[in-house]
């Protein structure tokens, strides 16, 4: 097993959340903001720095975040789309970083078993292979991006995420139940909280 101390993590939390009508990253779920949950998952994956890229809704997003990253990165270009946030995160990583985990804030229904399987897959291949969630047969976030991919990723623009690059590569896909259920609208958030309330009511 290779140490994961050379791997960083980026949590992308700069979006406008137009369909939600307020910053998704600041919304509360199970007593913590969605961003707090994502930062905690990032900590479980990475032995290196964890950065949160913010934009829309800042500083409220930071104020409501109980889990602090190693660095807050404000993306002044956040209105241009996700690609600028990914570029900001990659550009800020230390020069010795061999790869980064990239997480979103709107996938709280990913099942717990995914995170350990995800990390184990990255470490098994010594961080040399891109690894991503299997979203019904194609690769998507959360994802691990080896440094060799960064020059290509830095050329992305608009709302393009890493998915297009990952699909052109021999990306290892990890089953990720729940990753396809994004929280994008008030109805999604209401459903999510309803599911959680139902689970709690069944507990002894």
Which residues does each predicted region cover?
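Short aromatic/basic micro-patch
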Residues: 28, 109, 144, 182-183
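Nucleotide phosphate-binding site architecture
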Residues: 17, 27, 150-151, 190
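Short secondary-structure transition/capping segments
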Residues: 63, 85-86, 143, 184-188
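Single, functionally critical "micro-switch" positions that shape active/binding sites
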Residues: 14, 22, 145, 183-184
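Conserved nucleotide-sugar donor-binding
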Residues: 139-151, 186
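Conserved alpha/beta core of the MobA/IspD/sugar-nucleotide pyrophosphorylase nucleotidyltransferase superfamily
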Residues: 1-6, 151-204
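Nucleotide and nucleotide-moiety/phosphate-recognizing core
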Residues: 2-139, 168-177
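Hydrophobic alpha-helical segments typical of transmembrane helices
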Residues: 61, 114, 149, 161-162
């Amino acid at each position: 097993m290779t140490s994961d101390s050379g791997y960083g993590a980026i949590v992308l939390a700069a979006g406008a959340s137009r369909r939600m009508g307020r910053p998704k990253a600041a919304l509360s779920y199970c007593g913590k903001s969605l961003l707090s949950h994502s930062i905690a998952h990032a900590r479980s994956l990475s032995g290196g720095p964890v950065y949160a890229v913010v934009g829309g809704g800042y500083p409220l997003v930071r104020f409501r975040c109980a889990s602090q990253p190693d660095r807050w990165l404000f993306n002044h270009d956040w209105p241009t789309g996700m690609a600028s946030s990914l570029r900001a995160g990659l550009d800020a990583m230390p020069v010795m970083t061999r790869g980064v985990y990239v997480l979103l804030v709107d996938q709280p229904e990913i099942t717990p078993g995914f995170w350990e399987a995800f990390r184990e897959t990255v470490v098994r291949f010594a961080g040399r292979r891109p690894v991503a969630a299997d979203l019904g047969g194609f690769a998507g976030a959360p994802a691990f991006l080896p440094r060799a991919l960064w020059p290509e990723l830095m050329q992305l623009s608009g709302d393009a995420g890493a998915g297009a690059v990952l699909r052109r590569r021999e990306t290892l896909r990890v089953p990720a139940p729940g990753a396809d259920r994004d929280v994008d609208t008030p109805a999604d958030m209401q459903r999510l909280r309803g599911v959680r309330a139902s689970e709690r009511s069944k507990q002894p």
